[in-house]
Swiss-Prot record:
UniProt record similarity statement: Belongs to the glycosyl hydrolase 7 (cellulase C) family.
Glycosylation sites (chain numbering): N289
GO terms under cellular component: extracellular region
A GO term for molecular function: cellulose 1,4-beta-cellobiosidase activity
Residues spanning the signal sequence: 1-18
Sorted UniProt keywords: Carbohydrate metabolism, Cellulose degradation, Disulfide bond, Glycoprotein, Glycosidase, Hydrolase, Polysaccharide degradation, Signal
Transmembrane segments: none
Entry keyword annotation includes Secreted: no
Segments of this protein annotated with the region Linker: 468-489
Gene that encodes the chain: CBH-1
Biological process annotations from GO: cellulose catabolic process
Organism: Humicola insolens
Official protein name in the record: Exoglucanase 1
Compositionally biased intervals (Gly residues): 456-465
């Protein structure tokens, strides 16, 4: 947490029974609009807002302005135990621009890396899209697609401008945990597949037991408990490298873990927890194409990028494929093809993940935690959208943009980006690139094909690199396309059966019909 101290106003306390919310600084969520689309390609603007994660907020006594947490340490005279700390301390409202470097404009969100405020220096931020004042906006991604624009031109080696989904409670844990009185309005309830133990309040209690300040982060530490849930990394990136990664968990929603049994980054036993901390990642550089993503490359990171991610069902209605493509300069750019022998393809499937783990010699915790099918269960349920900017005190972000492990050069899968292995040291990045920022904008969500219906050059995602005319936009479902039966393979229920550039089966197994959703995507329904 990046602490701030404001010592002039009187606290306005919401409750005196548990983890509190105070208002020495009035909480005003910055507005951020997004678009909800229908199968016909019609999109409706949703006027929404964002909130800041509670871990970044000023935590002080409910009776005044004395810090409960300063630097990376708790005040044990106030916080004698987990429950009394939650009772005596509150998280406060945020001055989004001046303290945290967070600004919005219409459908655009900018997150600045380092912000020097009147009382503190803030590093990084984590924000959530809201549905009203007191709930997070949730998305059910399975069978749908999610699209956004991003500008990573101003974030380099060692930084991560991330957009992802986690299975956290829509109310921030307010209804499940009586000790939590702050809720989603104040950014509570975070969890992810690393089962992070640096969260200050978990399940409505302070994570004070066993808390140890970090040796290389003056603002963070780790406690006895962690908080776990399924995670779908749509976008982890800087201007040198990018990856998208599903992380299944055997327990989908938020759950608390203890000590090394949490697994993940914060524990000595990385794979001991209920979640897969590694996931099954698609990083174009790691998959052999070193000229696809970067400055002046096929996907040019000096310009704004439109990122489209589709979550396609298989014949059984489970998650079958995660497909990615890009739009830039008015044309579709299919995701790069993997050139690793035995790991061909440009999308994530169960078979692709199986082959990648073997080719790279990685521990296959992905399958241990349920693989694509288990990830699909999370995607079928409500997930919360997270947008953040951060540096990495554990491994200098080398796992994203350099060679990792650093002594594994030449080993299949070790080279993930062109950044030097000496890059990404947080103290250096914070000193040398404080004005770095990432901009997310033009968020769109809806059925397959709906979010790109109006985009110039939007063809079949991942199958056609040309520039076909934009699809026809209608307000009703397109008529079913019927074909004459003939020999050959047939697509199962939910599978793709047609579209611009599609080369697979165009007939469906009985009794399903190949139904045109738009010019570039037909599906067996």
């Amino acid at each position: 947490m990046r602490t701030a101290k404001f010592a002039t106003l009187a606290a306005l306390v919401a409750s005196a029974a548990a983890q509190q919310a105070c208002s020495l600084t009035t909480e005003r969520h910055p507005s951020l609009s997004w678009n909800k689309c229908t199968a016909g390609g019609q999109c409706q603007t949703v006027q929404a807002s964002i909130t800041l994660d509670s871990n970044w907020r000023w935590t002080h006594q409910v009776s005044g302005s004395t810090n409960c947490y300063t630097g990376n340490k708790w005040d044990t005279s106030i916080c004698t135990d987990a429950k009394s700390c939650a009772q005596n301390c509150c998280v406060d409202g945020a001055d989004y621009t001046s303290t945290y470097g967070i600004t919005t404009n219409g459908d655009s969100l900018s997150l600045k890396f380092v912000t020097k405020g009147q009382h503190s220096t803030n590093v990084g931020s984590r924000t959530y899209l809201m549905d009203g004042e007191d709930k997070y906006q949730t998305f059910e991604l399975l069978g749908n697609e999610f699209t956004f624009d991003v500008d990573v031109s101003n974030i380099g080696c060692g930084l991560n401008g991330a957009l992802y989904f986690v299975s956290m409670d829509a109310d921030g844990g307010l209804s499940r945990y009586p000790g939590n009185k702050a809720g989603a309005k104040y950014g509570t309830g975070y969890c992810d597949a690393q089962c992070p133990r640096d969260i200050k309040f978990i399940n409505g209690e302070a994570n004070i037991e066993g808390w140890t300040g970090s040796t290389n982060d003056p603002n963070a530490g780790a406690g006895r408990y962690g908080t776990c849930c399924s995670e779908m990394d749509i976008w982890e990136a800087n201007n040198m490298a990018t990856a998208f990664t599903p992380h299944p968990c055997t327990i989908i929603g938020q759950s608390r873990c203890e000590g090394d049994s949490c697994g993940g980054t914060y524990s000595n036993e990385r794979y001991a927890g209920v979640c897969d901390p590694d996931g099954c990642d698609f990083n174009s550089y790691r998959q052999g194409n070193k000229t696809f993503y970067g400055k002046g490359m096929t996907v040019d990171t000096t310009k704004k990028i439109t990122v489209v991610t589709q979550f396609l069902k298989d014949a059984n209605g489970d998650l079958g494929e995660i497909k990615r493509f890009y739009v830039q300069d008015g044309k579709i750019i299919p995701n790069s093809e993997s050139t690793i022998p035995g790991v061909e393809g440009n999308s994530i499937t169960q078979d692709w993940c199986d082959r990648q783990k073997v080719a790279f010699g990685d521990i296959d915790d992905f399958n241990r935690k349920g693989g694509m099918k288990q990830m699909g269960k999370a995607l079928a349920g409500p997930m919360v959208l997270v947008m953040s900017i951060w540096d990495d005190h554990a491994s200098n972000m080398l796992w994203l943009d350099s060679t990792f492990p650093v002594d594994a050069a030449g080993k299949p899968g070790a080279e993930r980006g062109a950044c030097p292995t000496t890059s990404g040291v947080p103290a250096e990045v914070e000193a040398e690139a404080p004005n770095s920022n990432v901009v997310f904008s033009n968020i769109r969500f809806g059925p397959i094909g709906s979010t790109v219906a109006g985009l110039p050059g939007a063809g079949n995602g991942g199958n056609n690199g040309g520039n076909p005319p934009p699809p026809t936009t209608t307000t009703s479902s397109a008529p079913a396309t019927t074909t004459t039966a003939s020999a050959g393979p047939k697509a199962g229920r939910w599978q793709q059966c047609g579209g611009i550039g599609f080369t697979g089966p165009t007939q469906c197994e009985e009794p399903y019909i190949c139904t045109k959703l738009n010019d570039w995507y037909s599906q067996c329904l």
